[in-house]
Structure formats: structure tokens, C-alpha cells
Amino acid sequence: MRLAKYFFIAAACLLQGCGTPYATMKKRMGEDVMLLGHDPVAYFTEKQSLRGDPAIKTSLPGRTYYFMSEENRQRFLAAPESYEPQFGGFCSSGAAFAIKLGSDPTEWEIVNGKLYIFGDILGHEAWRLDRDANISHAEASWSEARDVGWRWQSLKRVSFRVPWYKTGADIRREFAAKYPRRKWPDYDVGSKIQNYFSKDPGWRAREGHGPQPVVGFVGEDACPPACPRTSSSPFSVK
């Protein structure tokens, strides 16, 4: 069974590629951009998800960041480790299970001076159920996942789960027990084909999948909404 699973993962990666090691979206000119072009520094200074300007950018191996201002770019260059999102910008909830999948720049949180991004509101809510344990698990697993393409790593760890893995049903039960008066968000995550094979991380936010507001990809998509130096809106729980 294990051999069959590895064969499937290898075949999938041969057909679609193993994915990038960071949660990037590729521009038509080939640039791999983080956070759909949102400014990583603005999360700290403005406490908002704000789009950067493609003309004000800096590149690190495998990823490029846009900034609202030259001042923010210089802040980043002085200490990139202080501003880069944890776990390659992938969903911090999935990272707790050594999975690199999903990235929504409008779902974020800063804890102890570190920026955590989530794939969607469901990942964010799941992570909050046991924030410290999820951070600890993700940090312990990151050496395994850091340099691996997201598709390969996610398919591997969905097939061969870490001992502390939780299913969606497990998480919903925990949520109901902790918040008996709250409803689990009604959010469409898309299909497995879309999330694992046909789309890049961040696609749901970019396209406005289901009830998700269209965030767009600054420098690539129409303005509005994807205008430089503007804020972007997250999915709103009704």
C-alpha cells in the first residue's frame, strides 16, 4: 500500500510538477510573487493586509515581495527574517501537519512578532483551537518540508499522516465543544483537483472562489480590486 501511494505521488508530480517551495503565484513574465503581491511589512506597521507596488520589490531565492513604499522595502531588507511569513507563506494550520497547501494574504495573524498566514478562514479557525501546539508542531516539521515543493510535500503528508493529524471532522468537533454558540464557517474550499493539481496556492483569494471576495493579484489582475497600495478584504462570516 505504501509503495502504491508513493507511485501515485510520483506520477502526479511528473504530470503537474512538484510545486514551488514557497507559496508563490507566478506572473506572466515568470516572477514568483509572495502574498499575491501584498506588502509583508504592512502587516506589522499598518495592521492590515495591503497590496504592494510591483515597481517597489525585492527578490530572494524562489520568491519576490512587493512593497507599498521604499521605506517598507528598506525595512524588509534590513531584517527579512522579521517580516517574512512563517512556513513559506503556506497555511499555518496545514503546516502543523507538515502540509504545504493554501495561502490567503487576507487571513493572517501576528504572534510573538511573527507573521502567520492561513489558507482560508477554516484553517485560521482550526489553528486558533490550539495555537501554541500548532506552532510547535509546524516548527518541528518545517525542516522536513522547507525545501520541498508544495505539491509533493502535501500529497506525501496527506497520504502518510503525522501521528497528531486531525481530520476536518475532528476539528469541527473540537470547535463545537470550545464554541458551542458559534457556527463553523460555511466556506467552500474547492475541489481536491483544484487545490492539489490545477491551481496555485492563493487561487481562491485571487479569484474570489465561492463567497470569498476577489482579492486579485496586483500587477496581473484588473484594478480594481487589485490596485497597488490598497487594502484587501477577507471572507466575512455571516
Regions found by a protein language model. Give the residues of each.
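Sec-dependent signal peptide recognition
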Residues: 2-9
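Generic detector of N-terminal low-structure segments
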Residues: 9-10, 237
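Intrinsically disordered, low-complexity terminal tails and linkers in eukaryotic proteins, enriched
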Residues: 18-61, 82-238
